[in-house]
Amino acid sequence: MSVDFVKIAEKWQKRWEEDKIFENPSKLKYTEQEKKDKFFITAAFPYLNGVLHAGHLRTFTIPEITARYQRMNNKTVLWTFGFHVSGTPIIGLAELLKKQAPETIWAYNKLHNIPMGELQTLTTPENIVNYFSKKATESFKKMGFALDWRRNFKTDDETFKKFVEWQFLKLKEKNLIVKGSHPVRYCPSCDNPVEDHDLLKGEEATLQEYILLKFKTKLNIEIDGEDKEYECIIPMATLRPETIYGVVNAWINPNDTYHIIKVYDEVQSQEEGSDEISLKYNGIWIVSKEASDKLKNQDRTVELIKEIKGEELVGKIVINPVNNKEVPLYPADFVSSEMGTGCVMSVPAHAPKDFVALRDYYSSINKELTDDELISLIKIDGYGKYPAKEIVEKMGITNQKDEKLEDATHTIYKQEFHKGILNENCGEYEGIAVRDIKDKLASDFINNNMAETLQEFSIPEVVCRCGEKCIVKTVKGQWFITYSDLEWKKKAHNWVDKMNFVPETIRMDFHNKIDWMKDKACARKKGLGTRFPFDKDWVIESLSDSTLYMAYYTVAKTINTNNILPEQLIPELFDYVYYGKGDINEISNNTKIPVELINEMRNEFEYYYPLDWRCSAKDLVPNHLTFMIFNHVALFDDEKYYPKGIVVNGYVTIEGKKLSKSKGPVLPIEEVATNYGPDVGRFYITTCAELPHDADVKFKEMEHARDNLIRFYELATELKDTEKTITELSTIDKWLLHKVHSDLKIINESYNEFQLRKIGTLFYGLTHNLKWYKRRGGNNNQLLKYVVEIWTKVLAPITPHLCEEIWEMFGYNKNNNYISNETFPQLDNSYINENCELGEEFIKNTMDDIRNIINIANIAPKTIYLYTADDWKFEVLKIMMENKGAPVNKMMPLIMKNAELRRYGKEIPKLINEIVKNGISNPIDEENILNDAKQFLENEFQCKIIVNGEDIGNKKRFAIPNKVAIYIE
């Protein structure tokens, strides 16, 4: 049978929209029971710089299905979407399209499926926002999302901007917004700080604070026409300042360009309100050309004296600032001028890479590296004085290109960090654990003018969407949200302890992120979005205007449908709506918003909040989701308004390839809806992988999912005219009812726990169950129709269009009784019959045993004799069931308490082991089950079946509970 999933979807989407079935009416007052019966779920809204793709489909379909399920559980569901357009990515895209950048044109034409004629109109941010908001809306509708579109908004809507302004006013009132200097990710081309959404590469990049250890040397330099010897600083960057005590040499790249520079620290005036900067001389430094540029961007003014090649420094001696030891500079082409300062400390006793590099260098000058030259600084259990040397020799690492060198480095560094203790060579720091020393050492070294700091990216390449390579820059006069505030962090930690997380394992990720959180730049000079209320030259950036908007959903319908103007949305209005503060009549008079509409907004917020579940992919854990928690605990005094739970799913790949908006693959949602039908896409994307795992979309598997849905529809079609009344039930009928209702328990749990893949597995299991049912002679069409009805409701949240079609075909859709609004089926314990299931499993296992014998003996059976175990063996099983949790060695004394069983004492130990191996389960009436299935077994094996007949071949003695003895004639 051919099923047109697209046509079916279009039919029901039109009907739903006409009848507005996903729009909840507003009420003047909600009862306490109604408040308990609400369900508010959201997903992180999409950024509109491209079409919605398979990654969006997975993340958004999870809450979509959950919303439909909760609606079928008689909940009043709020499920809606906004669109994110803030920041610079859309401006950057407009500029690239205006310039007709070939790669961008290709990506949006070929990957995003935008016709060239339409693409040529997308040269302004406004056109891009309008175009992609329409495309996103179409995508959601084509996939059949049960959204309340009355609450939709874009983050550049003037009404939403008023909400964001209010949010920032509240943060400022709580002293959580400050102005100052701070290192940030920065795009020199856009002249703006950049956030994750602004990046083409390196979204995961964080800032790492390196310690610059100030080694000194003497060098003849001509300055202002005078050539004389000057003291110069050669700073060396490290994340582990304690290793300075083990420095033997330093590495410099002879082929790179180095700058001799005068360095001045830029000192901010301490006078309140003053932006004045003074310069403080910090000496002559020698660093790589790239490092010179870094220093300029991090609170330093740099004056170039001279440019030299690294080879001019090879062989020079520098002085270790902590112990005044002489340290030679050796050549190394592995030193990158882009990392740190272009000069690297060498600690061969503890760094396997340094040990191998120094050994290789000595070999090149016919010298041998001896233990006398190594300096030990850390004690680790399991290693001697020189761990790097030990592991290199143990792993047989022969040179610097050996792949094992990376593993060796990781092993030693991990061991030292977790178990290492500083030794006597570290002076006053002897006895301190490595994991506890960094901050203290850094502070001491900086206070003694032996060190400074330098911020670097945690990964090598960070690229803005405009194509420019990003830098770390200390921005002065920048506005920050003070996420480093310890009291604020404490509140966030406390709430994370109380929240629900799916999967549970991510709870600790949130705790870690809260611990790591530093002050965050929250505004920029360029971009779409809300003007910073305290300084209109700035615009609130895209990860700061998207932390509380779930609260805006609750009032957006009232604002949108009543044409409330931005200027009417004054802070006092939001104070009343979200805090209940102020005089409603006075606010109404000042805003010209009727009292009943203000009450409606207040009531809607009070009714739907808190947010029950927030859904997102895992990339938003370290930013948006954590910021959401921070902002809620800061802006609401009562925990009853805090978000209750977060659901995080894995990423999506296409046939093993990572999704990429610029390089492909993309797989737009509309393509899925058009080529496969929305129900197929919804079913497949939510059941192809466990929630926390990455989902790899395979088109063959999607076709397989489609085929299974077609088979289900075919079965429904065959049964559409069958009467619903179920009369007498056979054993196999009871088994099928048991399977359906035992599955319902798992299904309801799975929906509530976001374990949607289990439902897919059970759906595929239904196919196998129905095959077994028919194979066992099941032919009760009334029962089959009942099963299909149950499963049509089960699938309705996932494949709503197909299920509406079946519901109508069964005649249940009269008067617009949509299945989407039906009550979800629940477990009926009266149908649960464990003995039925055990009996069918017993038959299947018996059949497997018979086949194994036939195959091994290579015989054609004429008669099969089946023998069940003696009664005393079932008594043993009964005792074992009663003591199922007891260790096996404790079973024998328990059984021997039974006087009747003692005479079988020699046989019982073997029986116990056999029962354990076969599985301890409730005894069943095996003889009756076999006799009931006798005709079936005879048909299966085309021979006579005799149950507990004459004991031919003395086989009966081998029978144990749940495993018959078999003799084949």
Curated annotation (Swiss-Prot):
<dbReference type="GO" id="GO:0002161">
    <property type="term" value="F:aminoacyl-tRNA deacylase activity"/>
</dbReference>
<keyword id="KW-0547">Nucleotide-binding</keyword>
<dbReference type="GO" id="GO:0005737">
    <property type="term" value="C:cytoplasm"/>
</dbReference>
<dbReference type="Pfam" id="PF08264">
    <property type="entry name" value="Anticodon_1"/>
</dbReference>
<dbReference type="InterPro" id="IPR014729">
    <property type="entry name" value="Rossmann-like_a/b/a_fold"/>
</dbReference>
<keyword id="KW-0648">Protein biosynthesis</keyword>
<dbReference type="InterPro" id="IPR009008">
    <property type="entry name" value="Val/Leu/Ile-tRNA-synth_edit"/>
</dbReference>
<dbReference type="GO" id="GO:0004823">
    <property type="term" value="F:leucine-tRNA ligase activity"/>
</dbReference>
<dbReference type="InterPro" id="IPR001412">
    <property type="entry name" value="aa-tRNA-synth_I_CS"/>
</dbReference>
<dbReference type="Pfam" id="PF00133">
    <property type="entry name" value="tRNA-synt_1"/>
</dbReference>
<dbReference type="GO" id="GO:0005524">
    <property type="term" value="F:ATP binding"/>
</dbReference>
<keyword id="KW-0436">Ligase</keyword>
<dbReference type="InterPro" id="IPR004493">
    <property type="entry name" value="Leu-tRNA-synth_Ia_arc/euk"/>
</dbReference>
<dbReference type="InterPro" id="IPR002300">
    <property type="entry name" value="aa-tRNA-synth_Ia"/>
</dbReference>
<feature type="short sequence motif" description="'HIGH' region">
    <location>
        <begin position="46"/>
        <end position="56"/>
    </location>
</feature>
<dbReference type="InterPro" id="IPR009080">
    <property type="entry name" value="tRNAsynth_Ia_anticodon-bd"/>
</dbReference>
<keyword id="KW-0963">Cytoplasm</keyword>
<feature type="short sequence motif" description="'KMSKS' region">
    <location>
        <begin position="658"/>
        <end position="662"/>
    </location>
</feature>
<dbReference type="InterPro" id="IPR020791">
    <property type="entry name" value="Leu-tRNA-lgase_arc"/>
</dbReference>
<comment type="similarity">
    <text>Belongs to the class-I aminoacyl-tRNA synthetase family.</text>
</comment>
<dbReference type="InterPro" id="IPR013155">
    <property type="entry name" value="M/V/L/I-tRNA-synth_anticd-bd"/>
</dbReference>
<keyword id="KW-0067">ATP-binding</keyword>
<keyword id="KW-0030">Aminoacyl-tRNA synthetase</keyword>
<protein>
    <recommendedName>
        <fullName>Leucine--tRNA ligase</fullName>
        <ecNumber>6.1.1.4</ecNumber>
    </recommendedName>
</protein>
<feature type="binding site">
    <location>
        <position position="661"/>
    </location>
    <ligand>
        <name>ATP</name>
    </ligand>
</feature>
<dbReference type="GO" id="GO:0006429">
    <property type="term" value="P:leucyl-tRNA aminoacylation"/>
</dbReference>
